[in-house]
């Protein structure tokens, strides 16, 4: 490929917003995943909601483990740090509709392991036991396909679409204290966002 052809191709990519040129540094690929800033997430709404169906959370497991690299980065921890992972599924009657996984630094909230959060509110416990004052959260939203474990827990086929939301919550001192990964069944949920225009 000639230099002229390569230069023209890079110009076209830059015009399409796929790469960014910085004088003295070179050309950089821009992430294909949009980084939007909605004014307000209004709600996650169940489709075809049935009145008077009792919603419950069922515990899958709760354990202390070494932080996976991505979770360590979210919580600004070293890779060898111990974390608590709480994995639960939310049901409406007998139908599962989302999987929720909470991660915390183990030394920050050690008493979490002594409680059953299928019956008790995790947020209320954190507020009462540790007086955590939440300041803000950062959230990313993806569309993914269910792997075998997710499919089994949510009673769907492997490869079914899921709405995956990762939220990192910060305390009043701007420290990331909780990472929550939630996997919503795309056939039961949609996301409503309010935007300023």
Where do the language-model regions lie?
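Residues at secondary-structure transition points
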Residues: 4, 36-39, 117
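Residue-level recognition of specific faces of alpha-helices
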Residues: 9-12, 28, 47, 100, ...
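Short, cationic-aromatic polyanion-contact patches
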Residues: 28-42
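Acidic/proline- and glycine-rich, intrinsically disordered low-complexity segments
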Residues: 45-49, 124
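C-terminal all-alpha effector/ligand-binding and dimerization domain
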Residues: 54-197
């Amino acid at each position: 490929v000639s230099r002229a052809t390569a230069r023209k191709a890079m110009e076209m990519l830059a015009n399409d917003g796929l790469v960014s040129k910085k004088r003295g540094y070179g050309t950089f690929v821009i992430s294909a995943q949009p980084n939007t800033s909605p004014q307000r997430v209004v709600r996650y709404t169940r489709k075809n909601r049935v009145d008077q169906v009792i919603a419950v959370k069922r515990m899958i497991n709760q354990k202390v483990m070494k932080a996976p690299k991505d979770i360590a980065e979210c919580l600004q921890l070293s890779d060898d740090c111990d974390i608590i992972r709480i994995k639960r599924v939310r049901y409406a009657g007998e139908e599962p509709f989302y999987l929720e996984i909470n991660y915390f630094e183990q030394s920050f909230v050690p008493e979490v392991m002594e409680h059953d959060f299928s019956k008790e509110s995790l947020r209320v416990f954190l507020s009462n036991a540790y007086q955590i004052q939440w300041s803000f959260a950062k959230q990313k939203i993806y569309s993914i396909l269910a792997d075998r474990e997710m499919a089994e827990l949510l009673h769907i086929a492997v490869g079914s679409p899921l709405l995956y939301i990762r939220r990192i919550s910060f305390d009043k001192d701007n420290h990331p204290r909780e990472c929550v990964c939630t996997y919503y069944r795309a056939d039961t949920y949609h996301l409503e966002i309010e935007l300023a225009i």
